[in-house]
């Protein structure tokens, strides 16, 4: 059976404003400079730890700010976040396929957001004992959980392309997220989707190719 695995931030949900607010709330609490939306956009994608490493001034400890960020974001992750226009309709069109969401966002925030927007879809975020993407571990765990032996992976960043490559699954890269096409292309082979309305047909075609052994 073939399934579909989705990244969360920048793929299904536009989380950037809530992430920026949480970063800047944390920076203010520690007396550090604020960051622009464009800066935070570049920082995200490799987990909360890396986000805070890039956010604090070079050479400063990031562990204490990380704990503060996670605490604040967990309580404020739903203020400005919403699905990208057309995402809910695309998921409905794909409802016959087993689906899962795998994210480098902290697991508590992933489960909170997915319970609100994508109830019934298995979702996993970063948690102790499971390497974050681009390790293939999250993909393999999700595939086992939803009972599929093949899948197509959908994401918006170079991390997602590398994750799919490491898991030996085909990748569909969306262009409405946190990275531009050139950054994604530099990471490796992928197909590109320009709008959520195009996603069901593109995924259907990729699944057909996968099922036919192409």
PLM features: what roles do these ranges have?
Residues 191-195:
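Short acidic-hydrophobic, aromatic-tinged amphipathic segments that line or gate anion-handling sites
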Residues 95-97, 145-149, 206, 210:
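Glycine-rich phosphate-binding loop signature in dinucleotide/nucleotide-binding domains
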Residues 1-6, 201-204, 209-214:
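Non-catalytic pre-domain segments flanking phosphatase-related domains
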Residues 1-42:
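Active-site neighborhood of HAD-like aspartate-dependent phosphohydrolases
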Residues 79, 106-154, 158-167, 181-183:
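Substrate-recognition "cap/lid" segment bordering the active-site pocket of phosphatases
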Residues 75-101, 107-114, 136:
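Short, acidic loop-to-helix structural element flanking the phosphoryl-transfer center
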């Amino acid at each position: 059976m073939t399934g579909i695995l989705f990244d969360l931030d920048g793929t299904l949900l536009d989380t950037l404003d809530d992430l920026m607010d949480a970063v800047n709330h944390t920076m203010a609490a520690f007396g550090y400079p604020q960051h622009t939306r464009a800066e935070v956009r570049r920082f995200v994608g490799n987990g909360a730890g890396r986000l805070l490493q890039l956010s604090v001034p070079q050479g400063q400890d990031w562990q204490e700010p990380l704990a503060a960020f996670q605490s604040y974001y967990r309580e404020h992750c739903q203020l400005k976040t919403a699905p990208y226009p057309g995402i809910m309709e695309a998921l409905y069109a794909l409802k016959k396929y087993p689906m899962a969401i795998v994210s480098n966002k902290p697991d508590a925030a992933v489960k909170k957001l997915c319970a609100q927007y994508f109830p019934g879809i298995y979702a996993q975020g970063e948690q102790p004992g499971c390497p974050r993407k681009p390790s293939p571990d999250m993909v393999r765990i999700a595939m086992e959980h939803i009972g599929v032996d093949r899948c197509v992976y959908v994401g918006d960043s170079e991390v997602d392309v590398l994750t799919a490559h490491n898991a030996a699954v085909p990748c569909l890269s969306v262009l409405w997220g946190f990275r531009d096409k050139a950054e994604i292309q530099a990471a490796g082979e992928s197909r590109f989707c320009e709008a959520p309305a195009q996603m069901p047909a593109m995924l259907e075609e990729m699944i057909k190719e996968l099922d036919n052994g192409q």
